[in-house]
Amino acid sequence: MAQPVHSLCSAFGLQCCLLFLLASWGAGATTFQEYQKTGELSTSDHIFPLTPGLVYSIPFDHIVLHSGQRPPELPKSTEIHEQKRHCNTTRHSKPTDKPTGNSKTIDHKSSTDNHEAPPTSEENSSNQGKDPMIRNQRSVDPADSTTTHKESAGKKHITPAPKSKINCRKSTTGKSTVTRKSDKTGRPLEKSMSTLDKTSTSSHKTTTSFHNSGNSQTKQKSTSFPEKITAASKTTYKTTGTPEESEKTEDSRTTVASDKLLTKTTKNIQETISANELTQSLAEPTEHGGRTANENNTPSPAEPTENRERTANENKKTICTKGKNTPVPEKPTENLGNTTLTTETIKAPVKSTENPEKTAAVTKTIKPSVKVTGDKSLTTTSSHLNKTEVTHQVPTGSFTLITSRTKLSSITSEATGNESHPYLNKDGSQKGIHAGQMGENDSFPAWAIVIVVLVAVILLLVFLGLIFLVSYMMRTRRTLTQNTQYNDAEDEGGPNSYPVYLMEQQNLGMGQIPSPR
């Protein structure tokens, strides 16, 4: 009886061991695949360090088609020609109707590549040398985004189609997005904004030099406010990095001129009128003059109607993604003492839908808690300024999106990096590289599954061992009990159970008992 039970237990134990080995092998294969995916993610993160979502690349070469002026120069870096891209980007593109003056704009762009702002070039190079952006334990200089924008400006005659391939060294990813984990940067958004408020006063005059190249109106009070320009770029990055819009529109996506400005356009044509009404329903503080923004109506290139509708929809999307849209007060000195909340002002002229040849400055600003007098302006630069540090303008018909940014320190770039992390984590259904990360967030990681399987197998084996031990002890005890009962019965009823000496004494008399001699 004991041998069949023992053989059954041994066979069951061998089967459990085989199952455990198979589970461990499968978990190891899954871990290896995830490790390869992680390697691909790190490679793509090194290549595209600033892309929170894939967007249309809208170069700013459209600015000066009819004005005959030079576009503003991108910030120069000492490592522009040293850092090489490791990926070949091939875009499947289809030609659309573009004005014939684009070649002229490219010539203007190439002629102004070596033009620098005298007061700010040394500061920019020193800031770029000392404060590179650190994301995912890598040092990434903003020159990569500058070279990316130059390549996109060179391909200006072709509008990118909804598909793009990026052929890297080891893998091919469909979209050039970057996954970042929010626990590596160590600063939430609120801390980074408050730190920006502290550091913006120290670098109060970073971009104060502007060269007028033909229009002296646009130099009105556009100096000594780099902290507001930086705050404006932060707002633009927050509103345009929404992953929900990147799910809905299959756009070809790439980085733009600055490392913190991304412009998202969609193809929803039906929302144009509502976008115009929503933009006009906000505050229009035109009485500020030079206090609020330099609003310039300049002739823009004759774009197709689709571009106009895209930009209108873009303005609506920008408004919808921002949770708090409040108009700018008439005096900038009000409500600046105790708050770090962001306010956005999106201004559109009254005749923006009637005259498509005019453009209006759509301005976004963040008010940090810095004492600002009423005479100073919330500066955004227009297309007539020859030099700011970075100016990105998107003229598409009836609207023009003007955003600016200046680099104060590495804290600003870290704050911008922190803003993109929640969007990346929320994007559960985004295709491409985010699938592996969201798969890990939605389910248990492989090592946890392996540990659970190991613990379950060990507990099962211990339980089976206890059952086997109890059954064996019961059988042994039963055998011992039977042997004991048999021995006792034999001692009591056997022929040698009563002593012979006593029997002889009872049967024989005392005289018959032989006495020992």
Curated annotation (Swiss-Prot):
Purpose of the protein: May modulate NF-kappaB signaling and play a role in cell growth.
Expression tissues: Detected in lung, esophagus, stomach, rectum, skin, cervix, testis, kidney, uterus and small intestine. Expressed in pancreas (at protein level).
High-level lineage: Eukaryota, Metazoa, Chordata, Craniata, Vertebrata
Residues annotated as signal peptide: 1-29
UniProt keyword annotation of Cell cycle present: no
Native organism: Homo sapiens (Human)
Disordered: annotated segments: 67-341
Segments of skewed composition (Low complexity): 194-213
Localisation per UniProt entry: Cell membrane; Cytoplasm
GO cellular component: cytoplasm; plasma membrane
This protein's UniProt keywords: Cell membrane, Cytoplasm, Glycoprotein, Membrane, Signal, Transmembrane, Transmembrane helix
Transmembrane segments: 449-469
Polar residues bias: start-end ranges: 169-179, 214-225, 232-243, 263-283
InterPro entries xref list: MUCL3 (IPR026623)
Protein name: Mucin-like protein 3
Cytoplasmic face of the membrane: 470-517
UniProt topology in membrane: Single-pass type I membrane protein
Main location per the UniProt record: membrane
Extracellular side: 30-448
Record field: compositional bias (Basic residues): 83-93
Biased composition range(s): Basic and acidic residues: 105-116, 180-190, 305-317
Sugar-bearing residue positions: N88, N124, N338
Domain of life of the source: Eukaryota
